[in-house]
Amino acid sequence: IVGGTDAPRGKYPYQVSLRAPKHFCGGSISKRYVLTAAHCLVGKSKHQVTVHAGSVLLNKEEAVYNAEELIVNKNYNSIRLINDIGLIRVSKDISYTQLVQPVKLPVSNTIKAGDPVVLTGWGRIYVNGPIPNNLQQITLSIVNQQTCKFKHWGLTDSQICTFTKLGEGACDGDSGGPLVANGVQIGIVSYGHPCAVGSPNVFTRVYSFLDWIQKNQL
């Protein structure tokens, strides 16, 4: 995240770090699954991916879970970057504590342009910059779909965009992480023009994939 601030411990108990063995993407948790982006999982094997929960610091080990299965949406298109959603089934139930909690998923698609949303992640703090040790947080705004379509040709209704200003937004390593409105995850970090150069960030719209998520969380 470019332009963010250090997230306090326990404020985002649903956020996890995916590692192989270094941090490569973010995700959010339910009892047995991690929700993330498809592009995070493509080319990875379940044997190399671990899920790290319960800490805002990358160098402080809390709860570590092994991946049992990597599930990529079969309609994921790596050229158009649509249907960019995936799940990791972990090898045992995630144990909930004050610092490890599931994220709520949306029951309706009520989010609209101008709404404030919170993005969290351990992505780079500027283009080609370092990965921060402390989880970063930033408040962004939802952008009108039409405006976003001008900037990102091929945008679909199953995607959602954010923008605030130049110098704020997602960066490499934030992918797969949660975009949250009022405690409900509405987006998954998908792509943007790296990084924070004045163009909207694009997220997978969680509401559009509720059926897929349910079907694949056996």
Swiss-Prot record:
GO cellular component: extracellular region
Principal location listed in the UniProt entry: secreted
Top-level division of the source organism's lineage: Eukaryota
Protein name: Chymotrypsin-2
Residues at the catalytic site: H39, D84, S175
One annotated GO biological process: proteolysis
Miscellaneous field: An additional Arg at the carboxyl end was found in some of the molecules.
Keyword terms of this UniProt record: Disulfide bond, Hydrolase, Protease, Secreted, Serine protease
Lineage: Eukaryota, Metazoa, Ecdysozoa, Arthropoda, Hexapoda
Domain annotation Peptidase S1: ranges: 1-218
Enzyme category, top tier: hydrolase
Catalytic activity: Preferential cleavage: Tyr-|-Xaa, Trp-|-Xaa, Phe-|-Xaa, Leu-|-Xaa
Family membership: Belongs to the peptidase S1 family.
EC number: 3.4.21.1
Single GO MF descriptor: serine-type endopeptidase activity
Pfam families in alphabetical order: Trypsin
Keyword Secreted: yes
Xref: SUPFAM superfamilies: Trypsin-like serine proteases
Disulfide linkage: C25-C40, C148-C161, C171-C195
Subcellular compartments: Secreted, Extracellular space
PROSITE patterns from the UniProt entry: TRYPSIN_DOM, TRYPSIN_HIS, TRYPSIN_SER
